[in-house]
Amino acid sequence: MVMEIVKPNTCIRGCCTSESIPLHLPSSSFTLLSPIAKGSESVVYEAILDGRRVAAKKPILSTSDDLDKFHRNLQLSCNLNHPGVAKLLAAHAKPPNYMFFFDFYESGTLAEKLHVEEWSPSIDQVLLITLHLAKALQYLHNNGIVHRDVKPANVLLDEKFFPYLADFGLAEYKKNLREVNLQNWRSSGKPTGGFHKKNMVGTLIYMAPEILRKDMYTEKADIYSFGILINELLTGVVPYTDRRAEAQAHTVLEMNYTEQQLTVAIVSSGLRPALAEIGLHLPKSLLSLIQNCWESDPSKRPSSDNVVLELESIWEQVRGKQQGHLLEKTSNSQSDTDGADIIKNSGDYRDTVNWFSQGECLSKKSSVSTVFDVKLWSSSTDEPSRYVPVISCGSFATCGRRESMEDTHFIIPHMCNEESIHLFAIFDGHRGAAAAEFSAQVLPGLVQSLCSTSAGEALSQAFVRTDLAFRQELDSHRQSKRVSQKDWHPGCTAIASLLVENKLFVANVGDSRAILCRAGHPFALSKAHLATCIDERNRVIGEGGRIEWLVDTWRVAPAGLQVTRSIGDDDLKPAVTAEPEISETILSADDEFLVMASDGLWDVMNDEEVIGIIRDTVKEPSMCSKRLATEAAARGSGDNITVIVVFLRPVSTAERIY
């Protein structure tokens, strides 16, 4: 693809330029299609650029620092030219749509290959992939660049499964890192916390001990991360966990260590991921290389030049010198074909299950027979004097410090066109987002279909039926091999509030919670279902489940879940039940607002603080929800955060405090 370059080929600031990469594109030259991946800093789309299928990375530019980072990233990316580095095809470096355009890599990321498809590469495949990546790192380091986020999620695979090092959002020139050292930062009069925030970057489980100690980043930190990556490629295990599935990573990781505990163990105790076991075809020299790469002392780690030499030597030992031509990848050589055959023998499988769509289909089926001309849960008596709240509602959700979002939620005011019936719910996924995504689509239709029962019973049955439907759907996909992880058992906590005239019904399984502000004070509408609760512990044991003290608290074994009720988690049924606890509350004029939130909020904020923050915020429910979530993130919440705020009486958005 040859694209026309319009002169002057610079960014809006004039600081970025290229002779071969277009830096500003007419809007007619590209089309964004569906999102491929979403993160806290960018969204990646499948796109069409000048008639070619590409990947478009659209950064989230909320501050001037974000914009500065975009230009630094563009300057660096324009200077990269190596067969093992993801190629920048074009960029749009002018407002309002700042974007990067890259080749589209058919097989996704190495992380997906290992932990979604559960690929088990041969030693030949491991060596080819690691050697190509080592040469990409060698190229960067020899050009004075430190990547700072080497991990399988940042390795892309083409249709032949050759690897390409990608995502240079954190990459920096070594000279720039040396210029911004701690002493210079202090002399500028700036708080040292800002220095550490700018320099302690990357992904925790791949970060070198010196970075966790908040020392300066060097190329030796990339080597440490590369050693972790090689071991992960050999074992198929997410670092510091005992399971293959990426979806289970944060659950298992948290079961053993908090972030602080893991940091201390890596830095002070020399903790490392479980080393691959020596097998018949696994040379000891490769394991020695891994251990050398993750040495605590950076000076004892090999350079990228030495890593390449060692991997070439190991390859010759394994494959023989007569096949040494496979080591160099050129676009049209026979060695490419042979190498591709070696790497690709596992097939091109991608998990295609869309759990939102699966839930939506089932929801439509469940609601077909619902009679909507009958008033839902209508009152048995006509009392004109009965208090009926006037609602306004809003929500906010953020992935917080997580790399992915596993919460979902919905807000349905005036359900089925009933003026006084409203439904709200939050689903907090664990071991993946599948259960949460499915449940958010299914539950409303099931609640509507159960309108012939009482409102409380409708909620209860809807939870149980949603759980059953999800587990059946998951099993069906397992049987049809559309879900490749046989040991994948996703689940979610759930909390739903059904407001019928002046009655508020709350159903809950898990550790999300809901409170009312009643006459200025918090009024609990639910309680958390945790293994630390003696009643819940006894119930689980009575149902045949196991509760064990694991690291720091009671948990449901063997999965290590803290919650004792959930939707999904089919490996823990029936002990981890989906039957919710139901509360019924009669509302009055004393009730000011309802707050529902996932545990990412409640982990760092108590009921009184939540009430106080809303009282001190403009009375717009979405704004209140956002303020609570951002405050929780600022306080160090390590989880996804979802908040729903429902005002129960008329309020003015100009009113800041009561």
Swiss-Prot record:
Annotated binding of Mn(2+) 2, by residue: D428, D599, D639
Name listed for the protein in its UniProt record: Protein kinase and PP2C-like domain-containing protein
Classification of source organism: Eukaryota, Viridiplantae, Streptophyta, Embryophyta, Tracheophyta
GO MF term (any one): protein serine kinase activity
Cofactor note: Binds 2 magnesium or manganese ions per subunit.
Similarity comment: In the N-terminal section; belongs to the protein kinase superfamily. Ser/Thr protein kinase family. In the C-terminal section; belongs to the PP2C family.
Binding site for Mn(2+) 1: D428, G429
SUPFAM superfamilies: PP2C-like (SSF81606), Protein kinase-like (PK-like) (SSF56112)
Residue stretches making up the PPM-type phosphatase domain: 392-648
